[in-house]
Amino acid sequence: MTEIIEVHAREILDSRGNPTVEAEVTLLSGISGRASVPSGASTGEHEMLELRDGDPKRYLGKGVTQAVNNVIEKIAPEIVGMDCLNQRDIDYTMIALDGTENKGALGANAILSVSIACAKAAAAVVELPLYRYLGGVQAKDIPVPMMNIINGGQHADNNVDIQEFMIMPVGAPTFREGLRMSAEVFHNLKAVLKGKGYNTAVGDEGGFAPNLASNEEALAVIMAAITRAGYEPGKDIAIALDAAASSFYEKGKYILAAEKKPEKTADEMIRFYEDLANRYPIISLEDGLAEDDWEGWKALTQAMGSRIQIVGDDLFVTNKKRLEQGISKGIANSILIKLNQIGSLTETLETIQTAKEAGYTNVVSHRSGETEDSFMADVAVAANCGQIKSGSLSRSERLAKYNQLLRIEEELGDRAVYRGRSALYSVR
């Protein structure tokens, strides 16, 4: 009854109106699993290949019919007949079939869609919640959300360099309360921005995207919103940043257009972050330097890694080998987990385990081009990752993940654990 009898795929649209892959896996029992994959705007150089058609006459070259056909014509014949409960075998069969280092033959988007669809079908056939099927009885940590309430960089059409200014409800007793607190801050931020005459249109991830006087002004208005909502900055609500520094790294320099002194070295960037962390309750910094600036990253970790969380996204791209390289060099103390960066569920879970064994935190993350699929929320709980990024408090493709976590927390009842500030091991 757990045998795969059919694999299908189709082209659907993501939250930016661009095509992406959706796959369906049907079992002998008649049960099926369906999954769609996201797409990033600020993509790491070392990510697995997202296969696009490149035909300018269709979707401006962003069609995914080739990836869809690879699922139907190449992947399906290989995995039909396999047992959906053997996730690792299925994933490594697809990886071997692709045969490239970057999944460039079949496309990471093709492989991942099938990988997740298989997991969903398997959970359904054994009648277990997805997080329980993937994580077993120990799956109980409800992650602390990082909510991107001011969008900049490549996620917005504004003059703010830093890509994400996020809030984390570290003082909440439960996820449900943390979500409420964050929503109240979000709505108060809208009022603060309106009061200053700023635009309150939102960016790709549902956060506000105003033109501000500087990157620091984003922090100032967030602080005002936290206080206006009746919370204490740092104690109830902390701040996290995703600089996405590779996007403003040019010829060995970091160019912050919104700053009075725009051109900075790695050392000057570190001092810039240290100054902000000294004056604002920043507890996490993601991609503070460029993805291949290993020496800069080491200096950043040495300077700030004992007091805040230093997260590698473009640096590690959910890749176990790159993570192991970083661990050996003492670089960062946390990794961002994006399933489509590596392209299979099995490899994602292996990377999460490698990080845990090294004492690194895991932050499960969405992409800027998302779908309504909430699978990543179940993965975060299944692997007890403790933290999740799914955008702001608007746009339903973002809230789908948060709402799924509400359901999981309710289902777990007294067994649910919300760790708050302690989910960030390195924060003092």
From Swiss-Prot:
Family annotation (PROSITE patterns): ENOLASE
Instruction: Indicate where this protein is primarily found.
Output: cytoplasm
Q: Which UniProt keywords apply?
A: Cytoplasm, Glycolysis, Lyase, Magnesium, Metal-binding, Secreted
Q: What InterPro entries would the database entry show? A: Enolase (IPR000941), Enolase-like_C_sf (IPR036849), Enolase-like_N (IPR029017), Enolase_C (IPR020810), Enolase_CS (IPR020809), Enolase_N (IPR020811)
Q: Does the keyword DNA damage apply?
A: no
* Binding, (2R)-2-phosphoglycerate: Q163, K338, R367, S368, K389
Q: At the top level of its lineage, which domain of life is listed?
A: Bacteria
EC class, as a word, reads: lyase
For this protein, the record's Pfam families field holds: Enolase_C (PF00113), Enolase_N (PF03952)
The molecular function terms of the Gene Ontology recorded here are: magnesium ion binding; phosphopyruvate hydratase activity
The yes or no answer to whether the keyword Lipid biosynthesis is present is: no
Task: Spell out the catalytic residues.
Answer: E205, K338
Q: How is the cofactor bound?
A: Binds a second Mg(2+) ion via substrate during catalysis.
Q: Catalytic activity, per the record?
A: (2R)-2-phosphoglycerate = phosphoenolpyruvate + H2O
Requisite cofactors: Mg(2+)
Name any Gene Ontology BP term. glycolytic process
Residues given in the record as Mg(2+) binding sites: D242, E286, D313
* Pathway per the UniProt entry: Carbohydrate degradation; glycolysis; pyruvate from D-glyceraldehyde 3-phosphate: step 4/5
Family to which the UniProt record says this protein belongs: Belongs to the enolase family.
Give the protein's recorded name.
Enolase
Lineage, opening ranks: Bacteria, Pseudomonadati, Thermodesulfobacteriota, Syntrophia, Syntrophales
